[in-house]
Regions:
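Terminal, non-globular segments
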Residues: 1-173
Length: 173
């Protein structure tokens, strides 16, 4: 039941991401993304290969439904997915993966969750903005876009992490 609930939330958030990219493009110096936190909050029982397939499908759906270069979101999202477990281990410690706990900002701490979200979003945006610019934008414009997008996307992603990773289990197993 939990995975069904997570699947519905994931698809609704993917649709919200597509709507934001299509209809709320305020300035060319801002890219709002919630895809990295969606990947970060996948269950830890999900294998790396299944996570990569989910990331590829999510990126493909976002690229296909958004008026932009096809493959750009896939290019940026797959490395985030590939580095998800090492990132979680680096931020939360290896005991999270050893115990088989799920990611939860309430149980593991909102500060640590914000650090993990910021790191995954930074990796996504670094690849996305660099590939999107492709040498056509000056470095200052790319840096401003990266900083503004990282700040806004990380702030938006923290409540989304609470939505995707509810603390429904006991504190300790």
């Amino acid at each position: 039941m939990r995975h069904w609930n997570l699947s519905v939330k994931y698809l609704l958030l993917l649709a919200a991401q597509v709507l934001v990219w299509n209809y709320f493009n305020f300035t060319p110096l801002l890219t709002v993304t919630i895809l990295p936190v969606m990947i970060l909050c996948l269950p830890l029982g999900c294998s790396v290969s299944m996570s990569l397939v989910i990331a590829f499908a999510s990126g493909f759906a976002a690229d296909f439904l958004v008026a932009g270069p096809t493959g750009l979101t896939i290019l940026a999202l797959v490395p985030v997915t590939f580095l998800r477990r090492p990132l979680l281990s680096m931020v939360f410690g290896s005991e999270l993966l050893a115990r088989g706990d799920e990611v939860s900002s309430r149980r593991l701490g909102r500060t640590k969750m914000l650090i993990a979200i910021t790191l995954s979003t930074a990796l996504f945006l670094l690849i996305y903005i660099t590939a999107d610019s492709a040498g056509t934008s000056p470095l200052w414009a790319m840096a401003v876009k990266f900083a503004a997008s990282l700040a806004l996307s990380s702030a938006i992603s923290l409540p989304i992490a609470d939505l995707l990773c509810p603390d429904t289990e006991a504190r300790w197993k």
